[in-house]
Amino acid sequence: MTDLLHKLNFKIADASPEYKQRRKIQMIRFFTASAVTIFASRFAYRATVSRQYIPTLFQGNHSPPLSYNFTTDAAVAVGTGTLLCGSVTGMTVFGLCWILDVSNIQEFGWRMKSMLGGWESEKKLSEAPMDEESSYIQDSLNDILDGKYDFEEDTEEVHTAEMKTK
């Protein structure tokens, strides 16, 4: 198989076995979601056709038969719609993950950040000068995290200030 891929000049021929396995798993997920979508659409089609009301020659076509159950019909419609929506969404998500070579949420975040220019924006923002108030807050938080700030001393000062105001 690799010889054929080299002969046809495919880049995946030079890829590692781990990469090929990863792409294979992504492909299997997409095709599984596609198969579920096909089965769900066939189920929805059959559910719709079985509930179709076909009147006889002299019956009106505007009123359903007396044995018709609206509650069951509504429940089947909601369930079928939810099944179709979920399966199409899964197929779309797995298809995009296969195209973008993404296997988990963290990789999706990295990929979107790189595609939308997030790395450059973050670099520019980190190089920007910080204003005085933000610098003071950052230094205070760092002091608290480093254990340099004494909370007991601060509460004594607050109590002393409260006593003076009373």
UniProtKB/Swiss-Prot annotation:
Any Gene Ontology CC annotation: mitochondrion
Coiled coil ranges: none
Transmembrane segments: 27-49, 78-100
Membrane topology field: Multi-pass membrane protein
Annotated family: Belongs to the AIM11 family.
Domain of life of the organism encoding this protein: Eukaryota
Localization per Swiss-Prot or TrEMBL: Membrane
Name of the protein: Altered inheritance of mitochondria protein 11
Protein encoded by which gene: AIM11
Keywords: Membrane, Transmembrane, Transmembrane helix
Main location: membrane
Organism this protein belongs to: Candida dubliniensis (strain CD36 / ATCC MYA-646 / CBS 7987 / NCPF 3949 / NRRL Y-17841)
